[in-house]
């Protein structure tokens, strides 16, 4: 069997706000724009937004975005309105943040 991740789907009650975030703040190319379904090209997989309530008690996955220069990328995204914490360094650099619905996202050079 040969499978791969095709898309990550977030259910949201704020589809327009979330679309603006992934398109305008993170700079992802929007490839589908329907009333209750939006998709964004995230370089090898798609992030999809589906209008509707999240499942009660369920937390979404963390999406980790690769950035060669984590500090410069973080600074640019924060200027655009993204929320990220401090950069942590171990074997690699990473920085955690949240999208407008509170789903965890991360920048990493790993």
Region annotations inferred by a language model:
Residues 1, 74-75, 79-110:
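Vicinal oxygen chelate
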Residues 1-19, 46, 61-63:
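N-terminal beta-strand motif that seeds the catalytic metal site of vicinal oxygen chelate
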Residues 16-25, 104:
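Conserved active-site alpha-helix within GNAT-family acetyltransferase domains
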Residues 23-24, 41, 78:
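Alpha-helical segments within the soluble intracellular
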Residues 24-30, 82:
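Conserved acetyl-CoA-binding loop of GNAT-fold acetyltransferases
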Residues 29-61, 104-110:
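Conserved short beta-strand elements that form part of the metal-binding/catalytic scaffold
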Residues 63-77:
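Mid-chain, well-packed structural core segment of small domains
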